[in-house]
Amino acid sequence: MRLIREYKEYTLMDKISDKLSDIFPNIKIVNNVLLASSILDKSGKPNVRIDSKIHLKALMLKFEKNSIEIKSIVNSTGEKGLSQEVMRIILSSIDKDFTIIIDQDVSNGFWDKVIQKHPEYNWIKN
């Protein structure tokens, strides 16, 4: 049973990363954490730092058995709609019984609107 569950999680990560590759050229999955960015850091990993002085688009997701934790969505490029596109990809890839965890809400109301628009999911805001 454990192998089946792990395979399902891998498939979900794979499915989401495939869809995200249209937005983020650099994606890496390490120990159930997906890192995606428009640029690489000095070590060659996707740069997902919130405090980066470089203009970038970045995303960090953590996958658990029946949940996805959104650790960060960063868009310092000035382009509009990144968060909405990321959420469209995530919501179209998961089952309704999944829990979506918002790690830190510094969005000035974005997450409240998403939660209100999609009450069929189980949301947790930290």
Predicted region positions:
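Ser/Thr- (and often Asn-) enriched beta-sheet segments in non-cytosolic proteins
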Residues: 28, 35, 60-62, 67-69, ...
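Conserved acetyl-CoA-binding loop-helix of GNAT-fold acetyltransferases
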Residues: 79-92
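Charge-rich, solvent-exposed alpha-helical interaction surfaces
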Residues: 15, 19, 23, 89, ...
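Conserved active-site alpha-helix within GNAT-family acetyltransferase domains
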Residues: 92, 98-126
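A short, internal acetyl-CoA/4′-phosphopantetheine-binding micro-motif in the GNAT/acyltransferase core
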Residues: 71-81
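Short amphipathic alpha-helix that is part of the acyltransferase structural core
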Residues: 4-43
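A conserved beta-strand-loop-helix scaffold within acyl/acetyltransferase catalytic domains
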Residues: 37-72
